[in-house]
Curated annotation (Swiss-Prot):
This is Chalcone synthase 1A. GO terms for molecular function: acyltransferase activity, transferring groups other than amino-acyl groups; naringenin-chalcone synthase activity. It is an enzyme of class 2 (transferase). Pathway: Secondary metabolite biosynthesis; flavonoid biosynthesis. Keywords: Acyltransferase, Flavonoid biosynthesis, Transferase. Its EC number is 2.3.1.74. SUPFAM superfamilies: Thiolase-like.
Length: 389
């Protein structure tokens, strides 16, 4: 008879969890950041708030964002005027949009990842889906499984309403699933649409206005598994370790609340300071076992919550400017897409590394770090090992 120990050993993979494919998607509606303040104040019937508009223009100018993608068009907003007010009951209208569009955008990203992976979708064993855009039952995971035609036996996990750090969380969970289930192939999808957070401006709540200047829509998907099939699957990055921690004395720094008016967003000014002050502790805990203490020897994927966070992290750690190039590139071209950002940055990095002939998927370097930051304040730290290109 087989012992429990033998049975458990047979269930586990031998090698580390590996990212085997990445796909991304955005809505077709592209918004130019330089003209967005005029559009935003016009569509929200707020053009009389001239001083506030000037403040918003300065926010957009400082955002380091050139363009964003948004499902919400002028037509949709004109049909739903309550979404354009600052605090008008509008959750039903918002929910009607996101329960359809979040899985749909996720499907586009997933199809690209599956195509790159090159294996039949029937080989997908697990699905991990996350979004901060709306809540529904059965969830987006169920809707996506139906849209893609995944097997009914696919083991699903749905994460709602976690915020910007969760791009790191889903990698941590997928790592555990891949390494503890021999032969598992995990489809991970992050899909975000700002229809839940869009609202008009308010003089008394400038933190809400910060969100209007930063957030964009996007979905990203990866396929993850251990022990890639040689000659069939192409590894991109290996996941070596993953950790989550709460930043001390940071309660209330970032809050979101689902209300009749949609998802409200609250931000303390000190978020960049709190993150930069505590980031080295996470790095030390992650890289001391590997004997690494030079943060410039790593390739970097950091959730781009906003330019101030990136600037302060760079300053605090003495990072060379090029370290956050891929991160800043994604912020510039897409804005803050919450959970999807770090996967967009991974995609940007591996493509640029190949195009520039840098030798590895991680800008020619062997080891890297992926950071997720969000409500809590919660920090996700993922240690990555690159693959030769």
């Amino acid at each position: 008879m087989v012992t429990v120990e033998e049975y458990r050993k047979a269930q586990r993979a031998e090698g580390p969890a590996t990212i085997l494919a990445i796909g991304t998607s955005t809505p077709s509606n592209c918004v130019d950041q330089s003209t967005y303040p005029d559009y935003y104040f016009r569509i929200t019937n707020s053009e009389h708030k001239t001083e506030l508009k000037e403040k918003f223009k300065r926010m957009c100018d400082k955002s380091m964002i050139k363009k964003r993608y948004m499902h919400l068009t002028e037509e949709i907003l004109k049909e739903n005027p309550n979404m354009c007010a600052y605090m008008a009951p509008s959750l039903d209208a918002r929910q009607d949009i996101v329960v359809v569009e979040v899985p749909k955008l996720g499907k586009e990203a997933a199809q690209k990842a599956i195509k790159e992976w090159g294996q039949p979708k029937s080989k997908i064993t697990h699905l991990v889906f996350c979004t901060t855009s709306g809540v529904d039952m059965p969830g987006c995971d169920y809707q996506l499984a139906k849209l893609l035609g995944l097997r009914p036996s696919v083991k699903r996990l749905m994460m709602y309403q976690q915020g910007c750090f969760v791009g790191g969380t889903v990698l941590r969970l997928a790592k555990d699933l891949a390494e503890n289930n021999k032969g598992a192939r995990v489809l991970v999808v992050c899909s975000e649409i700002t229809a839940v957070t869009f609202r008009g401006p308010s003089e008394s709540h400038l933190d809400s206005l910060v969100g209007q200047a930063l957030f964009g829509d996007g979905a990203a998907a990866i396929i993850m598994g251990s022990d890639p099939i040689i000659g069939v699957e192409r590894p991109l990055f290996e996941l070596v370790s993953a950790a989550q921690t709460l930043v001390p004395d940071s309660e209330g720094a970032i809050d979101g609340h689902l209300r009749e008016v949609g998802l409200t967003f609250h931000l303390l000014k000190d978020v960049p300071g709190l993150i930069s002050k505590n980031i080295e502790k996470s790095l030390l805990e992650a890289f001391q076992p590997l004997g690494i203490s030079d943060w410039n020897s790593l390739f970097w994927i950091a959730h781009p919550g906003g330019p101030a966070i990136l600037d302060q992290v760079e300053l605090k750690l003495g990072l060379k400017q090029e370290k956050l190039r891929a991160t800043r590139e994604v912020l510039s071209n897409y804005g803050n897409m919450s959970s999807a950002c770090v996967l967009f940055i991974l995609d940007e990095m591996r493509k640029a590394s190949t195009n520039e002939g840098l030798g590895t998927t991680g800008e020619g370097l062997e080891w890297g770090v992926l950071f997720g930051f969000g409500p809590g304040l919660t920090v996700e730290t993922v240690v990555l090992h690159s693959v030769a290109t």
